[in-house]
Amino acid sequence: MLDEIAYRGPAGRAIVEANGATMGVVWTEPQSDSFSDLIAESLVRDAGAEGHLAEAQATSEGLTLVRDQLGRAPLYYGQMDDDTLCFASEVKAMLEATHDVNEVPPGHRYDGKKMKAYFHLKKKRPIKGSTEDIAHELQRRLADSVERRVSESGKLVGSWLSGGLESSTMAALARPHVDKLYTFAAGTPNAPDLEHAREMAEFIDSDHHEVIVTFNEMMDALPEVIYHLESFDALLVRSSITNYLVAKAASDYVPAVFSGEGGDELFAGYEYIKSMDIEDLPDELIDITNRLHNTALQRVDRSSAAHGTIAHVGFLDPDVVDYALRIPSDMKLHDGVEKWILRRAMDGLLPDSILDRTKSKFWEGAGVGEQLSQYAE
């Protein structure tokens, strides 16, 4: 099973046997004494960062699987013919053992018999306060989230950078904590994202790298993207191609990168939301956040893991999510401006052109959509 997903952990692997269970683990970086502590607890973990993990622990009562609150880390399980419970971070790792493959839902725990939820996103009472106070607290929580993940990465870290509000936020907040921040952008020649990413990289003085993608390179990468993505969903595949290629470039420089996923879901970043009644906004944002594990987070995990790196999703830190859900809806969608409170929170830390940039779909900003549409026709 480990051979099928060896790319997820190029730095090493181990087999843990305890309490009648055999568990394998691969890792992306040399392990510290903390890994020995996990082994002593009969525990293996696929960890993206604090609060983002999939975990399996063998006890005298059996094997328990736990997935993080929003499903940043993937986790699948199944029963073999002899009723042995098997699990893995990707479906392909399990297919020789069983075709009974199921997903542990985000925020759930499974003991081999019962699936039990330990976390649900819920509507929260809106906080009261001035725009300035709420923006300041949001910036503080985002900054704390990023700083913790920089520390976990040993201060050797990069950021995927599209030049959009969310990826620029991650890069700007990471920059003060490292001597050198590597940033990576991908797109077809003259793609809008490349221009905006260059501007942002210059603004924060990052070590910037570009991947200029040709149509033939996209077609060559497509089978690999589908293999790692484990999906034929057209929208998911289309948005994953440049993500996969930029992740490949980043893996030559850093073991971990920041990604801006979660910002649109928490702060009302999608165009269709503008036509909704404001009172319906909290439920809609919770719904699309709950679906991230099978959309953007699947893209981010598979793209980074395919090249042995970790993608940190700072917007989905539990402290950030908790606060974002309490921000009043009219501060997220304000006078027709999406993510308004996030723009206020990052005022002064980003160029005005980035602060004012409207949302573009991932594949459109990278220039991929038109070429793939022409090919399909």
Predicted regions located by residue number:
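Cysteine-centered catalytic environments shared across enzyme families
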Residues: 1-228, 348
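Glycine-rich phosphate-binding loop signature in dinucleotide/nucleotide-binding domains
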Residues: 152-153, 250-253
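Short glycine/serine/threonine/alanine-rich loop segments
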Residues: 155, 206, 231, 255, ...
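RNase H-like polynucleotidyl transferase catalytic core
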Residues: 183-186, 210-212, 283-284, 356-361
